[in-house]
Amino acid sequence: MRSPVSLPRRAALCQLAAVSLLASLHAGCATAAMPPLLDLQLVERDSGSVLAQYASAGRRYSPGSPGARYAIRLSNRTGERVLVVLSVDGVNAITGDTAGFGQTGYVLGPWETTDIAGWRKSDERIAAFEFTSLGDSYAARTGRPANVGVVGAAVFRE
């Protein structure tokens, strides 16, 4: 039985659930014998600290402090290019559309690591990722609260 978690506390926990499943996709099929294509970490932007991850029931969780800004560190763990379709709170990090597999993503070169600090507003501007309450989240304010707290990454070989 799950212990109850207050709404603000739950909103402050970023779920990395999709990553543990989707990052293990290899050429369209998941296999337990192959290592994941992608490593994903949350990085607190002010301190540069990588947030701890805790696994439970096939998902990974990282506790965050309300109001803290964070970046998502994507590391390609292969010797080939991969496409990462990234979403935060169910919103595509590049387009701002409700997240889906066939959307625009980030192409990472072999062994490349990059930090994504927010939703892309233009080529020069972003809206920073920030731990906040459900009601203050961008997704909830735009009528899409179902996936608040979820960081998702669909990873595809080129």
Where do the language-model regions lie?
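N-terminal export leaders
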Residues: 9-14
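Bacterial N-terminal signal peptides
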Residues: 15-26
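Intrinsically disordered, low-complexity segments enriched in small/polar residues
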Residues: 29-158
